[in-house]
């Protein structure tokens, strides 16, 4: 039974819901979507599961729109607030239960956040009659154990806190730093090299399945010559992990959906200006000049530039609710070679 969205793929994957798997008509159109934390919960929210489910359901229209347009999709999500909460649970249970290492906490958040996105997106696709399955893959991401970043806590995670709370944590040996939004704890964040499960993810995506992978950047691992794959106590930036995944699965496009309209020169100042189209050279010049301002935009632009330099057609950065318009260049920032 052929439909206008694509051609049924023979057979059924293990665990399939029974839907006919649909291959999008243009096999070159593969996109990796990096979802910011605002897709899961509002910044000032309570953070309980009911609120996160409600916010996730309300945030998925852009992904449904991409699916309806026939894009092959891999989704990478952040987990900053959630991993911070889990680290606080470790501290609260000190003396009662053995603490879980950070790589295990990342895998745990990837599981339950993936479940939340998977269920919510599958329901939304079904409502629109889009015959695509959604699955979550717990993902390991290879890093270099000798990367200096494995020993230098620089990445903010968890919820913001007041200075008094931050100073108490600092006195206990927890690295903290003041950010624009407030005080945050810090953790080591090495650069990703490759996704261990990339071949499995690629096969699923090529079959038309929407894959949620590298959740929270994926669990960092390294290759021990004697033991094989071993975990590392750190986190990976989700935008950089998404960029690496895009190269591993040969995606043509990469989009980072966040809570700002795109890349601004002099962001946060009276002279800020939205930059709609950039070449890789122009984007690199902005990074070198420090013209993107303080905050989290520079790592996003670095990831976008790396994706295009590795052979991707284009990388986009824009507001979550404008998803399809960002990908099609009507709003946000697009970076090309």
Q: Can you describe what each PLM-predicted range is?
A:
Residues 1-21:
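N-terminal amphipathic/basic-hydrophobic helices that include classical n-h-c signal peptides
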Residues 18-337:
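C-terminal catalytic "cap/lid" subdomain
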